[in-house]
């Protein structure tokens, strides 16, 4: 009989691994992505403002502490050649490098590398040691610097300590306090699963699933040993081109980042990978958050195993120079295997003086190595052309890399108005989506009065303002109404924006903006606010929608068309529209859009109800307009959705009829997006709340609050 006592408190399954509801009902809508990062998980005091805390940070002292850290080798994890620069750069790189442009998720903007799954990805091996080395500095400066900022700054200071003039640095990344639930990393069930297997991210002829950028589960970029671990630099080059493009990088930036990242530091594979313990999330308690511990052999210094590849890329791995290209182009390279059994390339007949010295003993020299990705820069014709230019023009290489590194580490921070600190570059860069400062000294009511005289209906005004604002992504802080880019390419031609209607509205509102010295961006939002006020009045409520002036108008020259193409809505459940049928259900696409817009489940619910009541569907369809008084900001959508005198029946793909139970007569039509608010138990609870007789005014007020949140989501300048 076991001496182990039975659980005296809640059953173990409630506090550890358990069968979640979506295990029993895998097709059920998972609202968890809207219920994360709230005050209950955040230990900071209510009202804590990171930007205000940053004002008390001694930036120069912090930078000097980081520089000192680089050469303060610790016995528990010795620095290669007495310098932690390579390790810190890899930590920063892998923090920022998870960003993908398709949905703006990933990246280093929230310090997510501290949590699962990223903290335990194979590609992040031993970065737990880098963060632990930073802990005394984080402890010292406390709330004045976030982990997210500190990890990226550590990479910057590592480069500066080794001789690179960096392009700049901006503070402003706020930490999260638990793993992100909204980021899709792939469907594979095993680390580093090769393509073509079950749940593969590839289909067809190596067609990588959107929105993914990395080639394997658990990798940041490409496989350094080759496609699926099979060396072939030309095939690897194609993977690199896709992966880096999905991170918003062109060929020149790809070559610069690869070469600049490998100019310093080394890879580690001098040992037996089988001796490594489990990753941090699976490690025993006594490891205290450390993973990949080697208790079978020495496992540190020259005997460290991380990727399995072994060696430095350059002769002098602790200084910034052009040595990477010197070795790449001066020697022929032969395929071999590391002591840990990983594929790598080593030079043929290399001169002794070109070999890097051992990390512990300067009297020992070893061959440098190149990964399959490095060899791709030599063998792919387009990459080689760029690499040769860098080889012959070191200053151009250094500047190009510094700019690409800045882009890599700041791409997910959004507009420049979010940047903070003394090292923010003065230069505006097109990938920052610059917006000129707008006028805020005017009477919004006078502008609304002019708009009211145009004859535009409330639905047209609301739809146009919504379309302008809905592109905002809280993931990378891109998009939104500021800039009025809805009037520019590519947005003005998007099917989602109903180009003909949009052109008509802009034709009437643009002269008003010009006459009154107001931005078109502000004018569009004011028009939407006016439409909401008119709809509320029709429902019997006199309200004034709050407004914050000062938006600017971006120019076409300030707008990277290709970069903005990824913001095109393929579906918008709030306007009951999708461009085509997708494998993903319409309600899942609604949930994804709501999460990207930074909405909670109640906010998503009240917005759907209000948009349906005001009849602002795309193309003027009446699906889901469950009211006899369209255009009125009433709670009729919820009242009729929850009314048991009606029954619902499917009549076509994504189309349902609402019929009177007694007569069988059709009353309305609706889509899956509409019906999910009566079907999903959580959303139905919200729908019933807003359908209550005593919540008619609450519904209007909550709609206005959520509407303003959408209109102002990108106002980091306000």
UniProtKB/Swiss-Prot annotation:
UniProt keyword annotation of Oxidoreductase present: yes
Enzyme class, spelled out: oxidoreductase
Superkingdom: Bacteria
One Gene Ontology CC term in the entry: cytosol
InterPro entries for this protein: Catalase_peroxidase, Haem_peroxidase, Haem_peroxidase_sf, Peroxidases_AS
Cross-link (Tryptophyl-tyrosyl-methioninium (Tyr-Met) (with W-93)): 221-247
Enzyme Commission number(s) from the entry: 1.11.1.21
Alphabetical keyword list: Heme, Hydrogen peroxide, Iron, Metal-binding, Oxidoreductase, Peroxidase
Cofactor detail note: Binds 1 heme b (iron(II)-protoporphyrin IX) group per dimer.
Residue numbers marked as site, Transition state stabilizer: 90
One function term, GO molecular function aspect: heme binding
Reactions performed catalytically: H2O2 + AH2 = A + 2 H2O; 2 H2O2 = O2 + 2 H2O
Family of the protein in this entry: Belongs to the peroxidase family. Peroxidase/catalase subfamily.
The protein's name in its UniProt record: Catalase-peroxidase 1
Classification of source organism: Bacteria, Pseudomonadati, Pseudomonadota, Gammaproteobacteria, Alteromonadales
